[in-house]
Swiss-Prot record:
Pfam families: OMPdecase. HAMAP family: OMPdecase_type1_B (MF_01200_B). This is Orotidine 5'-phosphate decarboxylase. Catalyzes the decarboxylation of orotidine 5'-monophosphate (OMP) to uridine 5'-monophosphate (UMP).
Length: 235
């Protein structure tokens, strides 16, 4: 991604919380330590999409992580509705029909479409169990090439794949990496993880961080430490 980003803007805080009230309380605790937030299934289905406009009006960026995957017409209509909310990013699964529909439907709204290659909780054995013949690395590469040809704005990938993908897609596609864990943090249910500094060095543009921040005793201090690590890695 050619755009120069401030360290704080490269950290996306995942608001994986059960209610709008809990999310708003976390945002208040984080204050100016964070500028970019992710709303996923849990919060979205608890009314969290109502926060998108308010956050945008407050100068924050919002990543709506719904991983849309349906027939093209249905995805397109969903993207049209979501594009009016004021979000910065929206995820879809990296299937050609889904990606094409999303790119066409967002129009000139400014909404950036991110394609999810392979979930960071999956490894080769999970793909084999699901019936895939390709391993994680091969499937990620295949989907990345398809996404680039379709005009996708960014890819969601594990930090382990970032360096490899950067060599494939160049600098014009943003790489967004979940599975970020500061040194010493628990991996949780993620199988392909990396520290913030290593992920930046591998070529990631944006780092999604959830539990290490929202479950920390001092979320603001945890977020500030990650931003400092990003700043050092990009200096």
């Amino acid at each position: 991604m050619s755009e120069k980003l401030a360290a704080r803007d490269r950290m996306i805080v995942a608001l994986d919380l059960p209610s709008v009230e809990a999310a708003e309380a976390m945002i208040a605790r984080l204050g100016d330590s964070a500028s970019f937030y992710k709303i996923g299934y849990q919060l979205a289905y608890a009314g969290g999409l109502s926060m998108v406009g308010r956050l945008a009006d407050a100068g924050k960026k919002v990543f709506v992580d719904l991983k849309l995957h349906d027939i093209g017409n249905t995805v397109g209509r969903g993207v049209e509705s979501l594009s009016a909310l004021g979000a910065t990013f929206l995820t879809v699964h990296a299937y050609p029909q889904t990606m094409k529909a999303a790119v066409e439907a967002r129009g000139d709204s400014g909404l950036k479409i991110l394609a999810v290659t392979v979930l960071t909780s999956y490894d080769d054995s999970d793909l084999q169990e699901a019936g895939y013949r390709l391993g994680v690395r091969e499937l990620v590469e295949q989907r990345a090439r398809q996404a680039q040809a379709i005009g996708i704005d960014g890819l969601v990938c594990s930090p382990e794949e970032a360096a490899h993908l950067r060599g494939i897609v160049g600098r014009n596609i943003a790489l967004v990496t979940p599975g970020i864990r500061p040194a010493g943090a628990a991996a949780g249910d993620q199988k392909r993880i990396m520290t913030p500094a290593r992920a930046i060095a591998a070529g990631a543009d944006y780092l999604v961080v959830g539990r290490p921040i929202v479950e920390a005793a001092d979320p603001k201090a945890a977020a500030s430490a990650i931003v400092e690590e990003i700043a050092t890695a990009t200096a």
